[in-house]
From Swiss-Prot:
<dbReference type="InterPro" id="IPR001752">
    <property type="entry name" value="Kinesin_motor_dom"/>
</dbReference>
<dbReference type="GO" id="GO:0098982">
    <property type="term" value="C:GABA-ergic synapse"/>
</dbReference>
<feature type="modified residue" description="Phosphoserine">
    <location>
        <position position="75"/>
    </location>
</feature>
<dbReference type="InterPro" id="IPR027640">
    <property type="entry name" value="Kinesin-like_fam"/>
</dbReference>
<feature type="modified residue" description="N6-acetyllysine">
    <location>
        <position position="101"/>
    </location>
</feature>
<dbReference type="Pfam" id="PF22923">
    <property type="entry name" value="KIF2A-like_1st"/>
</dbReference>
<dbReference type="GO" id="GO:0097228">
    <property type="term" value="C:sperm principal piece"/>
</dbReference>
<dbReference type="GO" id="GO:0005874">
    <property type="term" value="C:microtubule"/>
</dbReference>
<comment type="function">
    <text>Plus end-directed microtubule-dependent motor required for normal brain development. May regulate microtubule dynamics during axonal growth. Required for normal progression through mitosis. Required for normal congress of chromosomes at the metaphase plate. Required for normal spindle dynamics during mitosis. Promotes spindle turnover. Implicated in formation of bipolar mitotic spindles. Has microtubule depolymerization activity.</text>
</comment>
<feature type="compositionally biased region" description="Basic and acidic residues">
    <location>
        <begin position="158"/>
        <end position="185"/>
    </location>
</feature>
<dbReference type="GO" id="GO:0005871">
    <property type="term" value="C:kinesin complex"/>
</dbReference>
<keyword id="KW-0498">Mitosis</keyword>
<dbReference type="GO" id="GO:0098935">
    <property type="term" value="P:dendritic transport"/>
</dbReference>
<keyword id="KW-0217">Developmental protein</keyword>
<dbReference type="GO" id="GO:0007018">
    <property type="term" value="P:microtubule-based movement"/>
</dbReference>
<dbReference type="GO" id="GO:0008017">
    <property type="term" value="F:microtubule binding"/>
</dbReference>
<dbReference type="GO" id="GO:0007052">
    <property type="term" value="P:mitotic spindle organization"/>
</dbReference>
């Protein structure tokens, strides 16, 4: 039972307490401290147990029902705020409506009061009672208490330190408030989005920030999806663009999307996404690598296949993340994930359990541009991707360079980056137009032991974010959209252990086939986003794509929710085949599978366009290959014809033999050239079909991302 000094306070009950920032919430009493007349309370906040020592006056001022019966109740204070303001919650799609433009934010005007209650109002209450003519039956002792206040109590050192810190905090907050008001006055006249900026600032002020740190544990994921935010660049700062991305914790990303009502009132649509990791604009490449690609290095030493790729809008930081710091077309390769992964590979080779395996390290670097593969380490030679009888994908002619140290890897990366396809867009002066694939390969006695594929994807808005709309631009956009769609479905198949992986739908997934098949395969996706308000739509597209990828791996038991082809009745399958007009080749079957599983993103017209592009690319490769063969054959024809002409110089040459051989050469020429001409005609017809299909695409359909 509690003593008289503690009134009705007992261990185990819940009392209202006031935090140093002004918040009031409940906490449980865990101990009663008679030596300094205080109580110790505990509460749970964000999953952590916190505690605090509070003097009795502060407890009684907020909990008058616990005051001892013989004591005078302290003056009532302002009632605690509603429960909605006690706990800061991150609410998805929460709207913040604009207030009066010149009103300062309510949070910044709040001055935190002292932790100890002041009974200065008691004499005023007494005099007020006397003026009203009321008679008071108060004992002399109680009158003394009322006149001079409660007797002074000794403060503990802990309370004194807290009060000092609180006083400094109050001064600092007042200074910051004055500085914010001064800045607000300066920005108000020039920034057209000042109203939105104030709403974002007020919303951020209500959040509890716990960003990712190097001390946080690294979780094991077969499929890891994370997001990285870059800071505002010089161009965005000059344009007075606003930062609309907030990362309050290690796995949450919030987008403050500005919107406008019918009555022109502006408000924020605060959308929340959750991933495995979220990196803010202060996170360096080393920290991103620590949580993403570094856990995958050991996988390749255990005879596994690992894949790490950067995905996002043009100019959002993909090449910076994978390749290193960029300055125009120059790049510091030593600070990218390519080099950091190579460094750890060579460190792992020195471990005793791996050193005895006598592994050799090789590296390849190639790019995929408009459905074609080019070797970046061999003067950008065009390569062919074929599938052998064992259903193994082979990149014919791809050079593997043996590397002995990190410096060798940096040289190869520098060679590859110097000849990678790039161009100017509205987002970046040097934008990557292709998917760049850098592979670290481990071989043991010539046989493949493990492979780590690091991919810098092209911009996900490439089909729309260029100044022209010619055929080359359409091919770039079609191939990028198709490859990203196929990549998502391959990750779906990997996460759910599906029997079929639609890797043939694009060149990117075709060359990465072995990374999506097998029990010891792991994948990491780094979605890079731009913070500016002008990039809000592309940022949301990137986050939704990454969110769909992660949703597929949250619940492995939800495999039945997927809509495979077998979910359609047989008659509906026939209708779909008629609607899509698909042939029976493996590539088209996989493309059809992608479109049927993503009907909300891919319209029948868009599928027809993708099919026309695929057919055109296949025919282009065949025409070029046949033309090269005809050219080689023409050299032999010239030699044969030269021999025939030399034969006619003789006095008694055989005329019948000459005529027979010449006729044979001409017939062979006619047959081969006629066949080539027919293929060229078909190829030109395919070009026309592609152009017509591009005009039939419904612009209101979502992009196939």
């Amino acid at each position: 039972m509690a003593t008289a000094n503690f009134g009705k306070i007992q261990i185990g009950i819940y009392v209202e307490i006031k935090r140093s920032d002004g918040r009031i919430h409940q906490a449980m009493v865990t101990s009663l401290n008679e030596d300094n007349e205080s109580v110790t309370v505990e509460w749970i906040e964000n999953g952590d147990t916190k505690g605090k020592e509070i003097d009795l006056e502060s407890i009684f001022s907020l909990n008058p029902d616990l005051v001892p019966d013989e004591d005078i109740e302290p003056s009532p204070e302002i009632p605690p705020p509603s429960s909605s303001s006690k706990v800061n919650k991150i609410v998805k799609n929460r709207r913040t409506v604009a207030s009066i433009k010149n009103d300062p934010p309510p949070r910044d005007n709040r001055v935190v009061g002292s932790a100890r209650a002041r009974p200065s109002q008691l004499p005023e209450q007494s005099s007020s009672a006397q003026q009203n003519g009321s008679v008071s039956d108060i004992s002399p002792v109680q009158a003394a208490k009322k006149e001079f206040g409660p007797p002074s109590r000794r403060k503990s050192n802990c309370v004194k330190e807290v009060e000092k810190l609180q006083e400094k905090r109050e001064k600092r907050r007042l200074q910051q408030q004055e500085l914010r008001e001064k800045r607000a006055q300066d920005v108000d006249a020039t920034n057209p989005n000042y109203e939105i900026m104030c709403m974002i600032r007020d919303f951020r002020g209500s959040l509890d920030y716990r960003p990712l740190t190097t001390a946080d544990p690294i979780d094991e994921h077969r499929i890891c999806v994370c997001v990285r935010k870059r800071p505002l660049n010089k161009k965005e700062t000059q344009m007075k663009d606003l930062d609309v991305i907030t990362i309050p914790s290690k796995d949450v990303v919030m987008v403050h999307e500005p919107k406008q009502k019918v009555d022109l009132t502006r408000y924020l649509e605060n959308q929340t996404f959750r991933f495995d990791y979220a990196f803010d604009d202060s996170a360096p490449n080393e920290m991103v690598y620590r949580f993403t690609a570094r856990p995958l290095v050991e996988t390749i030493f255990e005879r596994g296949m690992a894949t790490c790729f950067a995905y996002g809008q043009t100019g959002s930081g993909k090449t910076h993340t994978m390749g290193g710091d960029c300055s125009g077309k120059n790049q510091d390769c030593s600070k990218g994930i390519y080099a950091l992964a190579a460094r750890d590979v060579f460190l792992m080779l020195k471990k005793p359990n791996y050193k005895k395996l006598e592994l050799q390290v090789y590296a390849t670097f190639f790019e995929i541009y408009s459905g074609k593969v080019f070797d970046l380490l061999n003067r950008k030679t065009k390569l062919r991707v074929l599938e052998d009888g064992k259903q193994q994908v082979q990149v014919v002619g791809l050079q593997e360079r043996e590397v002995k140290c990190v410096e060798d890897v940096l040289k190869l990366i520098d060679i590859g980056n110097s000849c990678r396809t790039s161009g100017q867009t509205s987002a970046n002066a040097h934008s990557s137009r292709s998917h760049a694939v850098f592979q670290i390969i481990l071989r043991r006695k010539g046989k493949l032991h493990g492979k780590f594929s690091l991919i810098d994807l092209a911009g996900n808005e490439r089909g729309a974010d260029t100044s022209s709309a010619d055929r080359q631009t359409r091919l770039e956009g079609a191939e990028i959209n198709k490859s990203l769609l196929a990549l998502k479905e391959c990750i779906r198949a990997l996460g759910r252990n599906k029997p079929h992986t639609p890797f043939r739908a694009s060149k990117l997934t075709q060359v990465l086939r072995d990374s999506f098949i097998g029990e010891n395969s792991r994948t990491c996706m780094i979605a890079t986003i731009s913070p500016g308000m002008a990039s809000c739509e592309n940022t949301l597209n990137t986050l939704r794509y990454a969110n769909r990828v992660k949703e597929l791996t949250v619940d492995p038991t939800a495999a039945g929710d997927v809509r495979p082809i077998m979910h359609h009745p047989p008659s509906q399958i026939d209708d779909l085949e008629t609607q899509w007009g698909v042939g029976s080749s493996p590539q088209r079957d996989d493309l059809k599978l992608l479109c049927e599983q993503n009907e909300e993103e891919v319209s029948p017209q868009l599928f027809t366009f993708h099919e026309a592009v695929s057919q055109m690319v296949e025919m282009e490769e065949q025409v070029v290959e046949d033309h090269r063969a005809v050219f080689q054959e023409s050299i032999r024809w010239i030699e044969d014809e030269k021999a025939l002409l030399e034969m006619t110089e003789e006095v008694d040459y055989d005329v019948d033999s000459y005529a027979t051989q010449l006729e044979a050469i001409l017939e062979q020429k006619i047959d081969i050239l006629t066949e080539l001409r027919d293929k060229v005609k078909s190829f030109r017809a395919a070009l026309q079909e592609e152009e017509q299909a591009s005009k039939q695409i419904n612009p209101k359909r979502p992009r196939a991302l």
